[in-house]
């Protein structure tokens, strides 16, 4: 959520920056609502002052033995007018807030201006895609060869865009998540967390999934109207519960940064993606991810973004997977991000790079919604923290990359050296 004072005092400057994202801010509508708010604010304050003054007059008149009934009626009338003005002001402020909740974050100045993914800018590349001297198999074919990926069983159990993993493929999937968690906790300084997979409405508002992206979520539907689970939703990413751990908190600046990680399943409806990536593990309704979240001082957030992205890169480097790093243009960034790096891993069967991690600086956009603040010992004044989030990594897509990049001519899959301790020393699947 943007700073309301910025929207009030510099609407044209805000509109210009939002236009870089392809978002049109209705400055005239906001201006009209703000003028009406000011009028109502003054009206309620004047009515409150007048009622207080007349209420005091009742006591004074009573002490003098005067008839207080006319004054009492007048105070009652002022009270009714005040209640009506307050109700109108509350409704207007709610309307302004509803509009503010749909406005995306401002892009950082260094973010390239563009319309969509075609305007993203490559920053660097790591590794060289392997040249195969045999016909490359995709991960679906490899998974079926080793009886490790069963999409038909998942359709029977649930529906499309789900999978049942079995045997050594399932074991490698688990090994990847354990390897990522160990790397982030033991070398990168993150604290491991286990979080709920169902969250409430306040949590979803805090990180920006609501109200704008309600259609992307899986919501619970209780059997009884009175059930207290009616407002729960499955998490689309561990960013949601991890970041909200600081909601409503005032943090000592000496305790920053706070660096958290969690391995969770993620649940997404994939609204708007009909017909895209229908084969395999690339786009699923349920997938695992190891998430990284940092809570930092405002002046440290850009450096933290570089650090966090480097942590995600380290996973790919240790796995020996070629990838490229890109900075997203203004038109392709997520709703809450001010700056985002994507890491795209090489997928041999598609002969292209595919997103495997997205790392974003959100500035104080989420913190303002959550009222997450920090305070130094030398200053009693609080300020909003900055929040960052990043994939470290998407486990299913990492499994795809390992299976395809490490495949052998006979269909076996070599186990990357860093994963072997998690697989009892196994060198090959198959």
Swiss-Prot record:
This is Serine--tRNA ligase. L-serine binds at residues 237-239, 291, 391. Consists of two distinct domains, a catalytic core and a N-terminal extension that is involved in tRNA binding. It is an enzyme of class 6 (ligase). Keywords: Aminoacyl-tRNA synthetase, ATP-binding, Cytoplasm, Ligase, Nucleotide-binding, Protein biosynthesis. One of its GO terms (molecular function) is ATP binding. It catalyses: tRNA(Ser) + L-serine + ATP = L-seryl-tRNA(Ser) + AMP + diphosphate + H(+); tRNA(Sec) + L-serine + ATP = L-seryl-tRNA(Sec) + AMP + diphosphate + H(+). Catalyzes the attachment of serine to tRNA(Ser). Is also able to aminoacylate tRNA(Sec) with serine, to form the misacylated tRNA L-seryl-tRNA(Sec), which will be further converted into selenocysteinyl-tRNA(Sec). It comes from Shigella dysenteriae serotype 1 (strain Sd197). Homodimer. The tRNA molecule binds across the dimer. HAMAP family: Ser_tRNA_synth_type1. Its EC number is 6.1.1.11. It is found in: Cytoplasm. Pfam families: Seryl_tRNA_N, tRNA-synt_2b. InterPro entries: aa-tRNA-synt_IIb (IPR002314), aa-tRNA-synth_II (IPR006195), aa-tRNA-synth_II/BPL/LPL (IPR045864), Ser-tRNA-ligase_type_1 (IPR002317), Ser-tRNA-synth_1_N (IPR015866), SerRS_1_N_sf (IPR042103), SerRS_core (IPR033729), tRNA-bd_arm (IPR010978). NCBIfam families: serS. ATP binds at residues 268-270, 355-358. Its main location: cytoplasm. Pathway: Aminoacyl-tRNA biosynthesis; selenocysteinyl-tRNA(Sec) biosynthesis; L-seryl-tRNA(Sec) from L-serine and tRNA(Sec): step 1/1. Belongs to the class-II aminoacyl-tRNA synthetase family. Type-1 seryl-tRNA synthetase subfamily. GO terms for cellular component: cytoplasm. The gene is serS.
């Amino acid at each position: 959520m943007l700073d309301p004072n910025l929207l009030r005092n510099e609407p044209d400057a805000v509109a210009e920056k939002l236009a870089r994202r392809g978002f049109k801010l209705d400055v005239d509508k906001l201006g009209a609502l703000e003028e009406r708010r000011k009028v109502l604010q003054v009206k309620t304050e004047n009515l409150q002052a007048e009622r207080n003054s007349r209420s005091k007059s009742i006591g004074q008149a009573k002490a003098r033995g005067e008839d207080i009934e006319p004054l009492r009626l007048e105070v009652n009338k002022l009270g009714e007018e005040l209640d009506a003005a307050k109700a109108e002001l509350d409704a207007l402020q709610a309307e302004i807030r509803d509009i503010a909740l749909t406005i995306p974050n401002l892009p950082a100045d260094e973010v390239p201006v563009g319309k969509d993914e075609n305007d993203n800018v490559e920053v660097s590349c790591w590794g060289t895609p392997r040249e195969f001297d045999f016909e490359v198999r995709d991960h679906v074919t490899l998974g079926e060869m080793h009886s490790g990926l069963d999409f038909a069983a998942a359709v029977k159990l649930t529906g499309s865009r789900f999978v049942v993993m079995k045997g050594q493929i399932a074991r490698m999937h688990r090994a990847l998540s354990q390897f990522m968690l160990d790397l982030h906790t033991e070398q990168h300084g993150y604290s491991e967390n286990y979080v709920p997979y169902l969250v409430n409405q306040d949590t979803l508002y805090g990180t920006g999934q609501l109200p704008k992206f309600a259609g992307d979520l899986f919501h619970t539907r209780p059997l009884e109207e009175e059930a207290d689970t009616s407002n729960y939703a499955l998490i689309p990413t561990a960013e949601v519960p991890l970041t909200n751990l600081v909601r409503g908190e005032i943090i000592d600046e000496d305790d920053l940064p706070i660096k958290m990680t969690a391995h969770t399943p993620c649940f997404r409806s994939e609204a708007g993606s009909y017909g895209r990536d229908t084969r395999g593990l690339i786009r699923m309704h349920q997938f695992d991810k190891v998430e990284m979240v940092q809570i930092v001082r405002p002046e440290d957030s850009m450096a933290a973004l570089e650090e966090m992205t480097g942590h995600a890169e380290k996973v790919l480097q240790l796995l020996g997977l070629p990838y490229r790093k890109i900075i997203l243009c203004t038109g392709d960034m997520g709703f809450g991000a001010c700056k985002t790096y994507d890491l795209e891993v090489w997928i041999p069967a598609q002969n292209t790079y595919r997103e495997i991690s997205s790392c974003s600086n959100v500035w104080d956009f989420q913190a303002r919604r959550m009222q997450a603040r920090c305070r130094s010992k030398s200053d009693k004044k609080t300020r909003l923290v900055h929040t960052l989030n990043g994939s470290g990594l998407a486990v299913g897509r990492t499994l795809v990359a390992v299976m395809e990049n490490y495949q052998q001519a006979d269909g076996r899959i070599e186990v990357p050296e860093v994963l072997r301790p998690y697989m009892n020393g196994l060198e090959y699947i198959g």
